């Protein structure tokens, strides 16, 4: 019959195996990336970089394994792992002296790179708020400027959604995060100005 003569059963079997393997490896990469971001948030940059290197090795291994099973498998489901690893890489570069290299960048699809960058910029909101709590408003403003730069870059990518794979939605979400962060910093600045005026007034009447 047509099913057996064309080997369709074997094709689907290979694709199923590739999908199951890809999902498993993608989950591992996502977990590694999340731990890297948490380490970077705690300013444990050495461990964050160590985890990124582990994630890159896992990604390279995963790609080889998937290709060995099927060259035609649709790896869309695998892109989440790529994106999360990109987020970890960009976030570490945003908050430390970690250098981005072409060797690392070339590992990823354009979609994973841009979405990962956007999510890393969103993660800077937490970093900015931490600095507000530490009364380091200048650093908070620096992170806000960096978030704005990422938004500007993403808005310059003028291609259909089918090509960018949902980048416009990701950009809109980041823009919303940026505006909330801007509002928080503005309130903190106004509070500081008020406190300074009160302190100046109290000194005058003392």
Feature roles, as predicted:
Residues 1-8, 12:
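Single conserved hydrophobic/aromatic residue that forms the stacking wall/gate
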Residues 5-6, 19, 86, 92-116, ...:
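Intrinsic, low-complexity N-terminal interaction/targeting segments
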Residues 10, 16-27, 46, 64-65, ...:
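Cationic, histidine-enriched alpha-helical/coil surfaces that engage anionic ligands
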Residues 26, 52, 59, 144-147, ...:
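Inward-facing hydrophobic residues that define packing positions of alpha-helical scaffold repeats
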Residues 40-47, 132-138:
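Short helix-adjacent coil turns
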Residues 51-105:
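Long, charged all-alpha helical bundle/coiled-coil segments in cytosolic proteins
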Residues 137-206:
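Long amphipathic all-alpha helical oligomerization modules
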